[in-house]
Regions:
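An alpha-helical, amphipathic repeat domain used for nucleic-acid recognition
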Residues: 1-208
């Protein structure tokens, strides 16, 4: 059986290179070496080498997934798409998804709440537009409908969007402001009742 003849650190990485019978064989994380109690002189069967390679790949691609999640929360579909772009096998992708779900890093319900909160704070949009966005993220229709019903008030969001946008229309007269603001709110996916209320609120000052 092949024998470990050297374990050498990689440059600029918390990983080690494993040499079998004097030749480089594969790289593994320092943590995996500790877990598997690998040391120079150990004999490794081909089956053991394959298992180490599989565990190493899982750790390596999990680290990639964690980095992807570090920028912002992700939907399950977003993570699947990301892993597929990295040419990761279906079996390994399933293992990564399972681990991330168990660790609560992937949860479409939590993702939906986060997405709606971000939209409400920074870019208010109507239910139709939000529905389309969440569908693109791979969320199921029942989940989308439930979360939108619970979390979204079109009237409040349209009013918030209108108050923010009207500031950029200062140089226009009231008629032109109304035309532009109406067009903007419709493009943001708001229904007519919410649009009408927002127009009255910011232009006719019927609602403060």
């Amino acid at each position: 059986m092949p024998r470990i003849t050297a374990i050498k650190p990689q440059k600029k990485s918390n990983r080690r290179n494993i040499y079998l019978d004097g030749r480089f064989a594969f790289g593994v994380s320092t943590m995996l070496i500790v877990k598997e109690k690998l040391k120079v002189g150990d004999e490794l069967s081909l089956e053991k080498v394959k298992k180490l390679s599989d565990k190493n790949n899982l750790e390596k691609y999990l680290d990639m997934a964690y980095r992807y999640l570090s920028y912002r929360p992700r939907s399950i579909k977003e993570m699947v798409d990301y892993l597929q772009k990295k040419k990761i096998s279906t079996l390994l992708t399933e293992k990564i998804l399972l681990k991330l779900k168990k660790q609560r890093y992937l949860d479409d319900l939590k993702f939906a709440y986060w997405w709606l909160d971000q939209r409400a704070r920074f870019r208010p949009r109507g239910k139709f537009a939000l529905t389309m966005e969440l569908r693109e993220k791979g969320l199921k229709n029942d989940l989308i409908k439930s979360v939108l019903t619970e979390k979204v008030s079109e009237e409040e969001l349209s009013l918030k969007a209108a108050r923010k946008k009207i500031k950029s229309y200062r140089r226009f007269d009231k008629k032109e402001k109304k035309k532009k603001l109406k067009s903007f709110l419709v493009r943001q996916g708001f229904g007519w009742p919410a649009v009408k209320m927002a127009l009255e609120a910011v232009l006719d000052k019927k609602i403060i």
